[in-house]
Amino acid sequence: MDWKHDLYKKVAPFIRSDAIFATNTSGLSITELSNGFTSELKKRFCGVHFFNPPRYMHLLELIPTSETDSDVLDSLETFMTSVLGKGVIRAKDTPNFVANRIGVFSILAVFAEAEKYQLGFDEVDAITGSKLGRAKSATFRTSDVVGLDTMAHVMKTMETNLQSDPFYRIFKVPQVVQTLIDMGNLGQKTKAGFYKKQGKEILVFDGANYVASTGQIDSVVERILKKPINERLELLRNESHPQA
């Protein structure tokens, strides 16, 4: 937040009176970011949240404050959809907006379950990807794509602002994420995070070192996942295997 405020102080005097001023943030309050602006600039300020990698990710969140001019939003949405080909949703100025509020909650919930049942990161990804109707990047590969430093900022926003949420107890940066950040392993952009490619081999972080990735779905759980969906959930609930 402070970094952005410092930057805004430097650029604000040079912003044309007909220019739209937009910020890309993963979840910081757009209203708080506009503190210190003139009333006229506040009308032309909003959040525009792209998703990584923006070249391929269709979703874009458009986040106004209570003072953003509706014409500004309409113009931006038209440009984003017709020129950039994005799928735009208008989000409220709440912590982490829509996608990260849901997505990072989902990742943190998986972290908690993985720790509880002592499951490896590659093992969890084998379970939480296409087998659950999600992207093949699943949980921890997705985290690597997002960037662990970026994801940690989103998690801290949840920890700071969502004390009344019933799942607040899991809203914190997991120790393993902090460990990887301290190592400088931020995910795909540093070529190492939860996963690391060494030659043709994919390695996975085990909490201390990178080891060969061998995670796969147990045959018991695999058989259940092939059942009709109306039977699948009950069978998983009744199965004692940690993956279930």
Where in the sequence are the language-model features?
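N-terminal glycine-rich phosphate-binding loop for ADP-containing cofactors
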Residues: 1-244
